[in-house]
C-alpha cells in the first residue's frame, strides 16, 4: 500500500503542477490582452508621405516593414547576429539596446541607427531606409525538387515566372518567407535518399513534430545564398542546412525549437509554392585581374557554385581560380562531379577536395587518409597545399563561406600571412 500511495501522490502532484502551469500561461495571455493595448502606428519613410505605412504596435520594426511589403534584409532571421537589418530612426527613436551599442558607433546611435529586428514599434516613427531595399520585390515560385545532397543539407530547386526574372548577381541572396506550418520530420524522407537515414536515426531526428502553426503572417523570413547563377533562370537553387536543436545524450533537446525556416524548407515537396524576396547581397565579384581562391565549407557550397559557374560558363573568365571545398566525407561532398567536369573543361580552374572525417568506404575506394592536403581541416590543408607556397598571398582575392568556425579559422590564417581584410570577401550570415 505504501508503494501505491507514493505513486498516487506523485500523479496528483504532477497533475496539480501541470494545472498551475496552464493557469499561469492563461493569466499571462489575458494580462497581455488587457494591459498591452495594440494600437495603430504610422511609419513615415524617407520623408515621403506616399511611403507611409500604418502598422500595429508591439511587433519589431523588421516584421512591421516586412508585412508592409518592405523586406529589409535579415540573413540571420532576426537573431541580431548578422547586423544587416540596419535602419535609421530619424524621429522618435527609443533608447538603443545592447545589440545596437555593439553594432553602431556613438555618433550613429545618436543619429538614430538601430537594428530593425530588435527595435519595437510602440509609436509613430520617421525612418530612413536605403532605396535599394524599397525597390526589392517578391516572387512566387514552384518547388521542382528538394533532395538531400548531404546528410543535413538540401538542394532546393525552384522555378519562378520566366516573365518576371529575378535581377540577382552571383554571390547574392534571397529571403524565403515562412508561412505558418506544422510538419513531422519523418515526412521529410519523401525527398531524402535512404543513404542518409542512418545518421538521422542515430541522432533520433525522425518522428519529430515541428509545430509553427501559430506563426503570425509574414513574421518569419531568412536569407539564403543562391547556388544558381543568372543564366540558369527561371530556375533558382539553394543549399540549405537543417538547424536542429543542440543534442543532449545523443538526442535533440526538446526544450529548444528547430530552425523555423530550415524546417519549413525541409518540409517542402515538388509542386509546393514558396515566396522569396530580394535580391540582396554585398559579396559580389570584384572584376579585376587578381587570381581567385574560394575557401568553402558545408552549405557555403551555394555561394561558391554561383560565383564559379558564372565566371567560367557565363563570363568565360581567364583568371586563375582555385576552389578548396571542405566536407566530412565523400557522402557529404556537394557538386563534386560538376566541379571535376569544369576542371577538365577549363585549364584555369583547379578543384581541391578536403575531407575531415573520411569514412572507411572512402578510404577503401582510394581516398588518401595520410595526405594532410586531402584529409584535414580545410584551413590546414589549404595552408599546406597552396597558401604556404605562394610568393605573394596578398596579391590574391579570397572568397570565404562556411560554418562559423571555418570562417574564423580562415580569416585568422589569412591575417597571419598579411592578407588585407579588403582582399577577403566573406559571406557570413551570422549563424
From Swiss-Prot:
This is Na(+)-translocating NADH-quinone reductase subunit F. The keyword NAD applies. Its cofactor is [2Fe-2S] cluster; FAD. Belongs to the NqrF family. The chain crosses the membrane at residues 9-29. Its main location: membrane. Residues 289-413 are annotated as: Catalytic. Keywords: 2Fe-2S, Cell inner membrane, Cell membrane, FAD, Flavoprotein, Ion transport, Iron, Iron-sulfur, Membrane, Metal-binding, NAD, Sodium, Sodium transport, Translocase, Transmembrane, Transmembrane helix, Transport, Ubiquinone. Its EC number is 7.2.1.1. Composed of six subunits; NqrA, NqrB, NqrC, NqrD, NqrE and NqrF. It is found in: Cell inner membrane. Residues 39-133 form the 2Fe-2S ferredoxin-type domain. It comes from Chlamydia pneumoniae (Chlamydophila pneumoniae). GO terms for biological process: sodium ion transport. Gene3D superfamilies: 3.10.20.30, Nucleotide-binding domain of ferredoxin-NADP reductase (FNR) module, Translation factors. The keyword tRNA-binding does not apply. GO terms for molecular function: 2 iron, 2 sulfur cluster binding; electron transfer activity; metal ion binding; oxidoreductase activity, acting on NAD(P)H, quinone or similar compound as acceptor. Residues 136-286 form the FAD-binding FR-type domain. It comes from the Bacteria. NQR complex catalyzes the reduction of ubiquinone-1 to ubiquinol by two successive reactions, coupled with the transport of Na(+) ions from the cytoplasm to the periplasm. The first step is catalyzed by NqrF, which accepts electrons from NADH and reduces ubiquinone-1 to ubisemiquinone by a one-electron transfer pathway. [2Fe-2S] cluster binds at residues 76, 82, 85, 117.
Amino acid at each position: 500500500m505504501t508503494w501505491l500511495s507514493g505513486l498516487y501522490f506523485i500523479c496528483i502532484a504532477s497533475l496539480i503542477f501541470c494545472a498551475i502551469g496552464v493557469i499561469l500561461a492563461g493569466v499571462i495571455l489575458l494580462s497581455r490582452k488587457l494591459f498591452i493595448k495594440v494600437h495603430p502606428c504610422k511609419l513615415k519613410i524617407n520623408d515621403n508621405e506616399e511611403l507611409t505605412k500604418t502598422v500595429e504596435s508591439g511587433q519589431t520594426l523588421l516584421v512591421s516593414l516586412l508585412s508592409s511589403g518592405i523586406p529589409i534584409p535579415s540573413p540571420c532571421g532576426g537573431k541580431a547576429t548578422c547586423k544587416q537589418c540596419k535602419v535609421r530612426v530619424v524621429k522618435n527613436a527609443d533608447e538603443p539596446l545592447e545589440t545596437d551599442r555593439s553594432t553602431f558607433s556613438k555618433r550613429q546611435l545618436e543619429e538614430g541607427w538601430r537594428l530593425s529586428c530588435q527595435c519595437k514599434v510602440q509609436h509613430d516613427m520617421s525612418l530612413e531606409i536605403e532605396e535599394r531595399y524599397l525597390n526589392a520585390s517578391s516572387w512566387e515560385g514552384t518547388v521542382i525538387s528538394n533532395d538531400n545532397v548531404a546528410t543535413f543539407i538540401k538542394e532546393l530547386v525552384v522555378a519562378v515566372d520566366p516573365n518576371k526574372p529575378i535581377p540577382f548577381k552571383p554571390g547574392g541572396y534571397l529571403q524565403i518567407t515562412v508561412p505558418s506550418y506544422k510538419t513531422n520530420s519523418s515526412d521529410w524522407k519523401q525527398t531524402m535518399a535512404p543513404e542518409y537515414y542512418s545518421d538521422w536515426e542515430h541522432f533520433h531526428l525522425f518522428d519529430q513534430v515541428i509545430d509553427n502553426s501559430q506563426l503570425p503572417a509574414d513574421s518569419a523570413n531568412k536569407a539564403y545564398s543562391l547556388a544558381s547563377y543568372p543564366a540558369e533562370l527561371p530556375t533558382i537553387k539553394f543549399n540549405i542546412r537543417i538547424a536542429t536543436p543542440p543534442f543532449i545524450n545523443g538526442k535533440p533537446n526538446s526544450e529548444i525549437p528547430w530552425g523555423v525556416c530550415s524546417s519549413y524548407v525541409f518540409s517542402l515537396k515538388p509542386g509546393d509554392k514558396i515566396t522569396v524576396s530580394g535580391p540582396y547581397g554585398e559579396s559580389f565579384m570584384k572584376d579585376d585581374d587578381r587570381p581567385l581562391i574560394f575557401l568553402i565549407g558545408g552549405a557555403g557550397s551555394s555561394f561558391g557554385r554561383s560565383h564559379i559557374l558564372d565566371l567560367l560558363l557565363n563570363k568565360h573568365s581567364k583568371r586563375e581560380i582555385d576552389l578548396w571545398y571542405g566536407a566530412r566525407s565523400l557522402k557529404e561532398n556537394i557538386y563534386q562531379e560538376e566541379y571535376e567536369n569544369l576542371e577538365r573543361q577549363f585549364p584555369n580552374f583547379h578543384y581541391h577536395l578536403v575531407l575531415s572525417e573520411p569514412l572507411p568506404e572512402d578510404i577503401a575506394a582510394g581516398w588518401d587518409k595520410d595526405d594532410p592536403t586531402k584529409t584535414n581541416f580545410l584551413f590546414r590543408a589549404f595552408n599546406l597545399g597552396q597558401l604556404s607556397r605562394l610568393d605573394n598571398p596578398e596579391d590574391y582575392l579570397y572568397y570565404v563561406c562556411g560554418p562559423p568556425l571555418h570562417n574564423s579559422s580562415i580569416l585568422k590564417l589569412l591575417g597571419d600571412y598579411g592578407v588585407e581584410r579588403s582582399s577577403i570577401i566573406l559571406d557570413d550570415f551570422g549563424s
